[in-house]
Regions:
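Conserved CoA-thioester-binding segment of acyl-CoA-metabolizing enzymes
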Residues: 1-56, 89
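Histidine-centered beta-alpha loop that forms part of the nucleotide-sugar donor binding/catalytic region
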Residues: 19, 64, 103
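Hydrophobic alpha-helical membrane-association signature
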Residues: 31-34, 80-83, 113, 186, ...
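Glycine- (often His-adjacent) and acidic-residue-rich active-site loop
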Residues: 33, 55-90, 106, 134-136, ...
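Short, charged, surface-exposed hinge/linker loops at domain edges
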Residues: 212-218
Length: 258
């Protein structure tokens, strides 16, 4: 990883920070590559059980760096398919909860990265923005799918075409954000929440994420069957036995992920 991403670890929490503050963490090919490497590192590391994704400086991300967005050999379509998509797929498929912590604002494809995370914490003075109709482009990074899934067609379309700021309080009301915290506590609050999640059974966290991601695209019965399959696997795990033993012994369980 280069300087575009800072990778840290606190206890069982990996903190992945986009580090282009002078460019408001605008996305470049290099940033996409470094983010993918960071998520791959977090996935391989068995000591990591939860991840916080955030941005250094005044913003989570202003979206694609337009100064660099039209340079290079790749078309815009290829950049989306072969640079951005692998990172977003990694976020969806990594068997660990990913919390997006949003300082300042998340705009453009930065909005997509925030929404695509498993959980979203926003600073109280932050906002989300889909600015595409002001620059004759279309929401990308899967934003159309995410917004329609979360808000329904009419509200999603309105928010996208009006290109208005959606402040943190409204995001909470809409169910987009999970938590809104004071701006000066955003990082600490997000890491603290992640640390709480690391106390949960990692196999259960992974299976629940897998099933719920599946549920967004599939029917009730296919989800039911997946639940049954995962339940059988988990019931046979050492962690399930530990959880039951800890319950009856009135102590905190010590999960090992197996």
């Amino acid at each position: 990883m280069a300087d575009t991403v800072i990778y840290e670890q606190q206890d069982a929490v990996a903190i992945i920070s986009m580090n282009r503050p002078d460019a408001l963490n605008g996305f470049t090919s290099e940033l996409c590559e470094d983010l993918l490497l960071a998520f791959e590192k977090a996935q391989r590391d068995n000591t990591v059980r939860a991840i916080v994704l955030t941005g250094e400086g005044r913003a989570f991300s202003a979206g694609a760096d337009l100064k660099q967005g039209f340079v290079g050999d790749r078309t815009t379509q290829d950049k989306l398919l072969f640079e951005y998509a692998p990172v977003l797929i990694a976020i969806a498929e990594i068997p660990k909860p990913v919390i997006a912590a949003v300082p300042g604002f998340a705009a453009g494809i930065g909005l997509s990265f925030a929404l695509h995370s498993d959980l979203l914490v926003m600073a109280n003075d932050s906002f989300l923005l889909s600015p595409f109709t002001t620059i004759s482009l279309v929401p990308d990074g899967g934003a159309n799918w995410l917004l329609v899934k979360q808000l329904g067609y009419h509200r999603a379309y309105q928010l996208s075409i009006e290109s208005e700021r959606i402040d943190a309080a409204r995001c909470l009301d809409l169910g987009i954000a999970n938590k809104v915290v004071p701006a000066d506590t955003l990082r600490d609050a997000s890491v603290a929440w992640a640390k709480e999640l690391t106390k949960r059974a990692p196999l259960s966290l992974a299976a629940t994420k897998k099933i719920m991601r599946h549920a967004m695209d599939n029917d009730w019965y296919s989800c039911f069957k997946m639940e049954a399959k995962e339940q059988q696997k988990l019931q046979e795990s050492d962690d399930a036995k530990e959880g039951v033993d800890a319950f009856f012994e009135k102590r905190e369980p010590k999960f090992k992920g197996r």
